Each structure stands twice: as structure tokens, then as C-alpha cells.
Amino acid sequence: MLRARPSHRLASAAAVVAATGAALLAGSSPAAAATCSDVDVVFARGTGETPGLGVVGGPFVRSLTGELSDRTVTSHAVDYAASSSQASAGPGATAMSAHVREVAAACPSTRFVLGGYSQGATVTDIALGIRTGTTTGTPVPAELAGRVAAVVVFGNPLGLSGRTIATASSTYGPKSKDYCNSSDSVCGSAPKTGTGGHLSYASNGSTTDGARFAAGLVRAAGTPTTPTPTPTPTPVPTTCVRDSTRDHVAADRAVSLYGRAYARGSRDSLGATSSYNVVSLQQVEGGWRLVTAC
């Protein structure tokens, strides 16, 4: 759970983001097109930012699109309030996971890159099933975890508790990267990855580096495979013949061995080869078997 002091830091950082957002806000990429893309980037903006990808998400998506120039890349800005109270992170996580579920169902070959900045990183944490102690939301279903190729977050408040996604999630940790600048108090004691403060991720190379990281994992993941339906076996025509033992032998439905007849394949005993007793044989895969009647 976030302590009172870190919450003040978050509020202060949020005010700075809101005040400078108009100057720094990058244009959001278009939402996912009607046709399915190879990669869909789902990004949550920071506290107080204008709806869209935000000051960090925009540059990150542009860099990732450039890194994956041989693939189709779409982006989706998570629709949530990004309020200063941080309580909107839970509903934001629910919105993020809902988008992943919707696209995954419609586009079985699409891979996802999830990410967020500041409170948007908390949105991402919760969507990955990480308990943050601030609010709750609906995570991405476990069965879709394999469709998420990479997770990249910037200025993640999870660092205030000394954690990163890599240490908090065994499922998503190996394919995640947390960026926390040396002077960024919002991400607390998380390992430092670059210079500057909470507003420097788009200008200090973090978004470019994060895009390279995500692109590498997207390429390594390949294309999701759609399970091949199990073919319905072709029914074997059922034939049943009622005849004398000797006639079954004559028709090769039975074999004779030392004066006794046996159904071909199953070796069911039919009695003496020369017998005129009438018995029923049913055709099965690989031969015939003795049945009570046809």
C-alpha cells in the first residue's frame, strides 16, 4: 500500500505533468483498425494527462512502430480517468484487460505490448494481476498471458514498495522492463535506468530503448498458433454377415487352423471348420468379430 508521503510525491508529479502536458503531449496513434494487426500496443497515460497515449506513450509507440517496420502495428490508449487520487487505476486496469480480451477474440494472430506511464504504470501492474494496495481491477485472463509479448512501463509507483514487474510477477516478469529515472521519486527505490526526473522518459532515450526491448520480444514470440481442430474420424461401414462356419471360412471372413475356425482379425473361435452351425460375424477395423446376432 502506498504511504502518505509517496502519495504527496505522486500528486506533485501529477500536477507537473498536467501543467506541462499541452507542450509535451505527443499525437496518439489511431486506434486499432477494423482489420487485425500483427501487434497491438495498449498504453495507459499518466495522471492528469489529456486522453490519448500521453507524453510518454506517443513517442514509445512511434519508436516501436519504426522498430517493427515489417509488421503492422496499431495502438490503443486506455480509456480511464487518470485522476489525481490514483483510484482510477483499478478501472483503468479493467479497461485495459477488456480491450485485450476483445481484440484477442477477434484477432487470433495479434500479439500485444502493454505499457503505461506514472499512474498508467499502476494500471498496467493491476492488469497483470499485481496487487498494488491502492485499488483493484480485472486482470488479463491467464489464458491470454501468452499473447502478451512484452510489457514496458515508465515511472512505475510500484517502485515505492521496492518492487518492479520483474520481481512481482512470475508470469510477466521475464518479458517486462521498468524504467525509473535517477531523480524520479515516483518510482521510489526501483533500480535506476536513466538520468532526469519524472518528465524525462521521452527525452532521455528511455522510450526508444523500451521500444527496442519490446520489438525484440515480439520477434522472438513469433505468430500465435491456432490449435488445429481434431479431424472427425470417418465412420467405418458396419457389415454383419450371418452364415455357416464353413461358409465364413470359404468367404475369407474366418481362417481355419487345425480343423477349427477363427474370425479373421479378432481370432474369435467359431467352432469346427466343417460345421454347418450358423454364426454372425460383424466387420470391424482390421477384420471380423463374433457377435450374438446381426
Swiss-Prot record:
GO terms for cellular component: extracellular region. Optimum pH is 8. It catalyses: cutin + H2O = cutin monomers; a tetradecanoate ester + H2O = an aliphatic alcohol + tetradecanoate + H(+); hexadecanoate ester + H2O = an aliphatic alcohol + hexadecanoate + H(+); a butanoate ester + H2O = an aliphatic alcohol + butanoate + H(+). Residues 222-241 are annotated as: Disordered. Disulfide bonds join C36-C107, C180-C187. The keyword Hydrolase applies. The record marks Q119 as: Transition state stabilizer. GO terms for molecular function: carboxylic ester hydrolase activity; cutinase activity. The active site is at S118, D184, H198. It is an enzyme of class 3 (hydrolase). Residues 240-294 are annotated as: May be involved in substrate binding. Gene3D superfamilies: alpha/beta hydrolase (3.40.50.1820). Keywords: Disulfide bond, Hydrolase, Secreted, Serine esterase, Signal. Its main location: secreted. Catalyzes the hydrolysis of cutin, a polyester that forms the structure of plant cuticle. Shows esterase activity towards p-nitrophenol-linked aliphatic esters (pNP-aliphatic esters). Can depolymerize synthetic polyesters such as poly(epsilon-caprolactone) (PCL) and poly(1,3-propylene adipate) (PPA). Exhibits some activity on poly(lactic acid) (PLA). Can bind but not hydrolyze poly(hydroxybutyrate) (PHB). Belongs to the cutinase family. This is Cutinase.
